[in-house]
Amino acid sequence: QNYKQAIINARDRSNVVTGRSTGHPVRCLRNKLTARFEELETSGASVEDIEKLGTGRLRAAVVDGDIEWGSLMAGQSSALIHDVRPAAEILQNMFAEAADVITRLPRFES
């Protein structure tokens, strides 16, 4: 639940990419973990040390709800999320919106 709330609270500048120096870039919400990643990467720490920092951090976020030291993987569009809804409801809305757009498209005659 903490992870979901963190995404809902995200703004357009809440994301950062970590792990570039390891060849495994990941976009996450900013927190203490991403700040530490940035410190290690800018100081020239070894790939091994950087990867060690990341071990188990996704589980910490998802399972344990640790939003400070867990890896809160979320893309740039996270700022567009304002509530938690069932996937079925989201898909139904998407299909309804798509159908509406299609009905408003100009008809092309061949």
Q: Which sequence ranges carry the predicted segments?
A:
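Conserved active-site-proximal phosphate/metal-binding subdomains
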Residues: 1-110
